[in-house]
């Protein structure tokens, strides 16, 4: 028995129209994705091209070792006997002292050098590199310790009451707080109230509190992703709650926890406002390990790459010398963040291949 074909719905959209709309939606989504990627590539390419001129050089050893191994200096540009000179602060003082000594020996008045000075446009960024690495490692260590502990409590021990829901809501709201607010919080609590002054420890704690929401949220999701059967099997064998978490849950959640650390590194390393109030100096003569006592290491300020970029960029008017330092510093800064993130990704992938279910 055959049935007559169903009458066509006059209100239904035509197939050709549906296909056109579907293709249009796909094209729009693709263009949006390409636009985001292109914008990021343009920014990175501009920094890489202009920064490479500062970091690399044409002659051996092909790397500007002065820029990577020396502290920042002011640049002095002047003309002497028809020759144009560009010297850093120390070299300029030595050069001027030598000329004055020669003039004094000859019984002549000292020559007058009319030099234009550009702050922090000479020298290097070695103390800034060291300070940035110390700030990232210390703050992420504190953030992972507190964040994973909080995530374990919320995921494994806490119930579903109103207090727990309020805590989760507060954590989500903290993720949207501007970094300048965290900087003022760290300044008021750690620098003033606790008397730590501008120091590594104050910067570590401030940055750790700032990145805690990201670490807690990602770690809690990683813990929840571990199958419940792992917990039940461990408890059935007589293990305690903590033994179950330590042996049957945390190892399998580590890849997700390291993902949160990668996100945290990207944010911590690039923040300027928090460290400007709590940890960073514009210039400092001593390196972090040049201290008299071990405890002085934690209560000293450091120089940092993002703050150095801010200081150099804020010099008005802008000039070619300062711009060279800006892009060179930004290029090195991106490389450091990329290397730290790449190391975290390698560790995460190794753990992911080791702990599978």
What are these language model-derived features?
Residues 1-33, 345-357:
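Transmembrane alpha-helical segments of polytopic membrane transport and secretion proteins
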Residues 35, 122-153:
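Transmembrane alpha-helix signature in integral membrane proteins
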Residues 41, 45-122, 295-296:
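Short membrane-interfacial helix/loop motifs at transmembrane-helix boundaries
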Residues 139-171, 192, 345-353:
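Transmembrane-helix boundary motif in ABC transporter permease subunits
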Residues 71, 275-333:
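Interhelical loop and adjacent transmembrane-helix boundary motif
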Residues 218, 241-281:
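Transmembrane alpha-helices
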Residues 171-208:
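Generic hydrophobic transmembrane alpha-helix motif, especially the helices
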């Amino acid at each position: 028995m055959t049935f007559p074909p169903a009458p066509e719905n006059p209100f239904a959209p035509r197939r050709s129209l549906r296909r056109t709309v579907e293709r249009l939606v796909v094209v729009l989504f693709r263009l949006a994705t390409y636009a985001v990627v292109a914008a990021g590539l343009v920014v990175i390419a501009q920094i890489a091209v202009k920064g490479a001129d500062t970091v690399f050089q044409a002659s051996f050893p092909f790397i500007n070792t002065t820029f990577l191994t020396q502290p920042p200096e002011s640049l002095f540009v002047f003309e002497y006997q028809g020759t144009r000179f560009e010297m850093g602060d120390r070299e300029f003082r030595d050069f001027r002292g030598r000329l004055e000594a020669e003039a004094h020996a000859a019984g002549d008045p000292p020559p007058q050098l009319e030099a234009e000075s550009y702050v922090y446009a000479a020298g290097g960024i070695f103390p800034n590199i060291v300070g940035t690495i110390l700030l990232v490692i210390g703050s992420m260590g504190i953030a992972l310790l507190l964040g994973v502990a909080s995530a374990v409590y919320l995921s494994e021990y806490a119930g579903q009451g109103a207090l727990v829901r309020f805590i989760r809501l507060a954590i989500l709201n903290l993720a949207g707080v501007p970094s300048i607010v965290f900087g003022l919080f760290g300044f008021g609590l750690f620098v003033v109230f606790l008397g730590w002054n501008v120091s590594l420890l104050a910067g570590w704690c401030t940055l750790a509190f700032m990145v805690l929401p990201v670490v807690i949220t990602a770690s809690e999701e990683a813990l929840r992703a571990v199958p419940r059967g792992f917990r039940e099997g461990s408890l059935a064998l007589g293990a305690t709650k903590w033994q179950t978490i330590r042996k049957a849950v945390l190892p399998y959640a580590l890849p997700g926890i390291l993902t949160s650390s990668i996100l945290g590194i990207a944010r911590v390393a690039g923040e300027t406002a928090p460290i400007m109030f709590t940890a960073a100096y514009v210039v400092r003569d001593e390196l972090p390990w040049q201290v008299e006592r071990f405890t002085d290491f934690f209560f000293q300020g450091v120089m940092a790459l993002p703050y150095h970029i801010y200081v150099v960029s804020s010099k008005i008017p802008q000039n070619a010398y300062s711009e060279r330092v800006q892009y060179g510093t930004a290029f090195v800064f991106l490389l450091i963040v990329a290397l730290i993130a790449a190391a975290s990704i390698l560790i995460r992938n190794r753990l992911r291949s080791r702990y599978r279910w």
